Amino acid sequence: MHQSITIHATENGKFALAKPCELEKLNPKELLLYSTALCAGMTVQAIAEKERVKLLKLEIKMSGELDTEKVEGKSKFESFNIAYNIECKHIDEQPKVSHAVQLATDKYCGGLAMLRKIAPVSHSMSIVSVEVEA
């Protein structure tokens, strides 16, 4: 069974669920995906800030495949995928954003490191630049 959660950064730098939903209504498997997406998002934000890159949009979809037909207590994840959709201001910022995502995914996000011990984790990213004239 496929489970997924999507979060996005808000104006104040916090994260919110993409679909209007309360955290209390998420099942434990979705909560695991949510916490990992949150960890990755906060890590990407911190690295981008150190690189002096302002992210105009940051959306993260975290998904996983369960080994059962429905969500059960005994259900185990067989694989995970994290997809980043990011907007930055200038095209020359794209390499820095890509590097921030790579570092967060491969090195600094503890949530993803823990999931790698459970099942394989793949990732993808889409980075779009929006040239804004003054």
List the predicted regions and their residue ranges:
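Extended beta-strand/beta-hairpin segments
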Residues: M1-S35, M42-A134
